[in-house]
Amino acid sequence: MKLGELATRLGAELRGDAELEVNGIKGIEEAGPTEITFVANPKYASLARKTQAAAVLVEPEFPEIEAATLRVKDPKLAFTRALGIFYQPPAYAPGVHPTAVIDPTAEIGAGAHIGAYVVIGPLVKLGAHATLLPHVVLYPGVEIGCRFFAHAHSVVREFCILGDDVTLENGVIIGADGYGFAKNEQGHWEKTPQSGPVRIGNRVDVQANATIDRATVGETRIGDGTKIDNLVQIGHASHVGENTLICAQTGLAGSSIIGNNVILTGQTGVAGHCTVGDGVILTAQSAVSHDILPGKVISGSPGFDNRVWLRAVTLFQRLPELAKRLDRVEKKLAAHLPSEGTDGTEK
């Protein structure tokens, strides 16, 4: 592809040779003379001056460099779209593999690809242009919208409801029983039936080995446009809003309420029945045990305001030094104070 054509498709201002041929995209240090790269973080600006890439996606105000530049408002977004141009994932032709098991009461939309050893249970409704790769299982009564893409070994349990353009990566489990038990008269833990389904909106991505549990009663809900990373656990009856990002190894206890446009970074935790308001950011390894107002940035365990947390962490790192200073002050004070006798009188 000529660089000029790529610039047009990305809506970029090109400064450089429009006839230059490019055939791929790589990181700033790996890209070669026929590939493009991008700089979204200013700390990598020096690398752009040394890159071997044919062209670099940059912001409009970026200084001139030897390589051609494709100037856009959001280099990271342009990079994402350029990847979609150069990288074409495998195509899966419509059809049903002979080893697939499909209940006769299931409704399969037009253009579906049903891979090897897929199991589709009774009364399933699967929308048009779905792709189910090997060993995907849809339990009875599942309803799924159009353009569903399920990678190998993902499972959707009974009566769960998924919208359009949902993607499940490998090993995802939607609708497994929530963690509910009650102690009986003999002191044994008795399993609480988990009767409520999971309801997932449109354009939701769930990454590998994440789990979203079904509700005891009611529903577990995931809003439109939300993206869930690897190894995330969402407990029963939790509600997650729209366009929220939940990063790897995060855990939401049962009945958590997460708002819209929230970012839960890696290894964060939210206690049961807590509400996290719209636009909140939890920084890595934060733990929330109380409601969080909209727009807050929270850090630490237990979590509190990020600005206070940063000051506290700075102070914590200085504790050994402060302890030494305090010890010196105490010794100086002791040297200037009169000592007491055994009867309490001054010597």
Residue locations for each model-derived region?
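Structural signal for interior beta-strand "rungs" in well-ordered beta-sheet cores
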Residues: 38, 95-305
